[in-house]
Amino acid sequence: MDSRLKTFLKFIRIEHTIFDLPFVFIGIELGLLKTHIAFPYIKIILIAIAAILARISGMTINRLLDLPLDRENPRTKHRELVTGEIKISEARTIFIISSILFILVAFSLNILAGLLSPIVLLSFYLYPLTKRIPIISHFILGISIGIIVLAGYVGISGSFPMQWQLYGYSVFVALWIASFDVIYQDQDREFDRTKGIKSIPVLSQGKIKVPVLMINLVSSAFLIISSLGFLNLIFNLLSGLIIIISVHWIGRKHIDTIFKEFYLPIPFIILFGISLQLLL
């Protein structure tokens, strides 16, 4: 792979972008259930492209706004903006182009998606700006990902979501992502404390298991009550069980291992359960 392309993919955290796509497809599937239209391949591809563009825009602005902190944080000194592998001017260009393209693709789907597209972008931009407000930044990040469930629905149907289950799934995603951000931020607890960042790890003095468990219990409850039928319920119960078990391994396994073993499979399990329920 070309080294510049590899650097770009690393900069935008392409693996996290792929991780988000199943949440978009939850909204798409429920939107197709409402509209009863033939499988719109082009539209689905455009929605996936829009999700990727939104994530690129959000990741880029996050890196730009966090650059002063990243330069001082030993854990983030290897990041591409800090090392100069990606120039600040290049990052700004990536941000502008991805944001504009996202809005254009959203309008190409339907008017409502286009009009609501700035809200999706704004949710990504708020995350780095709220890190000094106690606790809230974890949930802002969660909302920015949870909202894409609704965005998938709007993109495919052109209307506001009416099924309460869709909002339940959106809340589940928001809380579940927030719980992982708490685990992730624990890596920077001492650094964040010196910089006045009031994350849950800082406020709890590193005792994050209880808050993470509480968030995961609530998120799992939303996941289970949002089930569309028996088959969907089985897979959601399995996902909820994995989510709760993951708390046990905090501090026992590296965060990357927790992500790969307990977080990465969840969206695919849930999506498979929904797909199976709707097909049978």
Model regions and ranges:
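Multi-pass alpha-helical membrane architecture of UbiA-family
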Residues: M1-L280
